[in-house]
Regions:
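A polyanion-binding, active-site-adjacent surface
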Residues: 2-221
Length: 221
């Protein structure tokens, strides 16, 4: 089985599928050797239904959201130590939503802003009345996979249970309450799951656990 087919199969498994036809797995290999090429492809992406609802090009839509630190000006650090990945950008909130300032302050304690890179599993905002679908994940996740390969960060912080399971390609992992703070090593990169900011906003007691996860990341850096 080709690597691209295996990757797709693992994504479907993470979604809970037990059977996937060969036709579904027949999508072509997509591999970007440079970040500029990946961003250009993202800007013109029409692979899923979200392309019909976004305003402007995909990459511009990706840049327009209010986010913290270097992601606001969309500059890519020359030496990425920490890559932070959330499920999808919010149409109105920033990367950290109402907790943006608090997350920013916590990150200041573990890593220099110019060494942090922010990204999303799904590049376009998902309308509030629409659930994340397997199609969105399958079409968009390869962009992130290649982005990680290009940037080669020391640590990838995955925010939220679904995002963690897709990035780690393992739907059998425990829930985020048990999963957070664990360290998974692959290809010389440490992957650390933690809570999504929106989840923390609804469950304030998780904020301290999130900060503890960040301290664990500091040790890995």
């Amino acid at each position: 089985m080709q690597s691209s087919q295996l990757r797709r199969l693992l994504y479907y498994k993470a979604f809970g599928y037990r059977y996937v036809s060969a036709e579904i797995l027949s999508g072509g290999e997509r591999f970007f050797k440079a970040l500029d090429a990946l961003k250009s492809a993202t800007a013109e992406c029409n692979l899923c239904e979200l392309a019909k609802t976004r305003a402007g090009s995909g990459e511009q839509n990706f840049k327009n959201f209010k986010t913290i630190k270097n992601f606001k000006n969309s500059k890519t650090p020359a030496n990425v130590k920490l890559m932070i990945v959330a499920l999808a950008p919010g149409a109105n909130d920033g990367f950290g939503g109402s907790l943006e300032a608090e997350i920013e302050a916590a990150l200041d304690q573990i890593c220099a802003p110019e060494e942090i890179y922010f990204s999303f599993l799904i590049r376009c905002a998902v309308p509030q009345n629409r659930r994340v679908s397997s199609e969105m994940i399958l079409k968009c996740a390869p962009y992130l996979t290649d982005e990680i390969k290009i940037l080669k960060p020391k640590v990838v912080l995955c925010l939220g249970e679904l995002c963690c399971k897709i990035v780690l390609r393992n739907g059998d992992l425990a829930g985020i309450d048990a999963l957070h703070g664990s360290v998974f090593n692959e290809g010389g990169i440490s992957f650390v799951p933690s809570f999504d900011p929106a989840f923390i906003a609804q469950n304030p007691s998780k904020a301290e656990l999130f900060k503890e996860d960040l301290q664990k990341i500091k040790e890995l850096l």
